[in-house]
Amino acid sequence: MSTPLLVSPPVTRRFGLAGLGLATLLPMLAGSMANLVLPALGRDFGVPFASLQWVLVAYLLGITSLTVVAGRFGDRLGRRRLLLWGTGVFALASLLCALAPSIGWLIAARTLQGAGAACMLVLSLAMAGELVPPARRGWSMGLLGTLSACGTALGPSFGGLLIGGFGWQAPFLLLLPLALLALGCAWRDLPRDEAGSAKGGLPLTSLLLLVTALLCYGLALTRGSPLGAWPGIGALVAMVLFVRADSGARRPLLPLALLGASRRRGGIIASALVASVMVATLLIGPFYLHGAFALDMGTVGLMISMGPLLAALSGMPAGWLVDRVGATPVVRLGLGLMVVAAVLLALLDRALGPLGYLLPILLLTAGYALFQTANNSAVVGEAEGASRGAVAGLLTLSRNLGQLTGAAGLGGLFAALAGRPDLALATADELAFATRVTFALTALLLMSALWLAGREERAVQGDVARDGCESGER
């Protein structure tokens, strides 16, 4: 008599997916709500905007610094194990943020929170395919994309409501029980794993140089840095030294060989470009809607949430579409919609009112939902199982580098175009001008991503045709 196969019951899969879903939602929630926390922090701590900006930048630096390490350690030590540790660190850091007595304490806690978030994002993306059959991989990516968008959508609205009623500490306290719930679901139902076959220690020199390069990059992009051009020079030098050290390492920190596939390389670069646009949109929206139309912050938060909410509703249909027509057509469709939306925002007329801003934003986020689901499915889904964590780490790294560039670089450009060190003092016309010019630049970035998607696909088709010719000759 044959031995029956042991299959996990549906409830186990549901709890496991719930844990991965919360591990995807919470980092996005922690990131998006900070935009509305900044004004309250400025009033309580009495610090300038340049210091407040580091509440955002520190979180992104924490995420970005650990994305590749999380993927490597996940492949080597076990993805479930590292996901549990990362979620625990995120919960602890959320409590430390709420207890922060100074802006320096808060920035340090946000860095730690970002480190935990990196493990959550990378490992949830890498493990999603393990809980569903290959035919439903697009569905699982759509689920994570939906929850990611939900986190981005809930951040501004919940942040605004909680800050108004209970102070800026309340949003951080809300993250604590949710993180503990994610930890419980993952602990109970995610499949246990063994350490990977990879051996050898972590290249600490490469890691230190990478963190130094990222820190200098963040300082260089922060407007008003007293160090002048030195952070930019430091970032360049540290990156050159990192490439030299890492290329000579026995087990390099960045698995750059994984970028050899044309489609994967194009998807990772496009992810960075799109992420820079989306985070800049979240940063610009509150200042434009509040300053140009005198809307209260509660209304502003609800309006900003509508775009990510639409993306959340589009995530599952996007996954369904990917499963049926393939990832590449959906990537092109999503980027095309985003280009149209960015052009409309670049031509924005303030006489159209808040609705004139909101409608293109809705189109932009719908396109983003299509792009993210299809791109994640193509980049991570096509990787081999042993390297899926590393590929997910590269994808998350590119996205967070884009977010860092958008928050510091495009945000600084927007402030410079407004012509005021303090954006609260900018006039409605100055804010409208800064918004139009910034979105004109984002349209160019999105056009570059669309061109890149087409170029990489043609390269893949050329490789396939060349392989076919060589097979025919043999």
Write out the residue ranges for each language-model feature.
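Structural signature of transmembrane alpha-helices in multi-pass secondary transporters
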Residues: 24-28, 56-59, 63, 90, ...
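Extracellular/periplasmic helix-loop-helix junction of adjacent transmembrane segments
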Residues: 37-65, 105-107, 293, 298-302
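Helix-terminus/helix-capping segments at the ends of transmembrane helices and short amphipathic helices
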Residues: 39-42, 128-133, 138, 142, ...
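Helix-loop-helix hairpins in multi-pass membrane proteins, especially solute transporters
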Residues: 67-69, 75-205, 351, 411
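Hydrophobic transmembrane-helix bundles of small-molecule transporters
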Residues: 164-270, 277
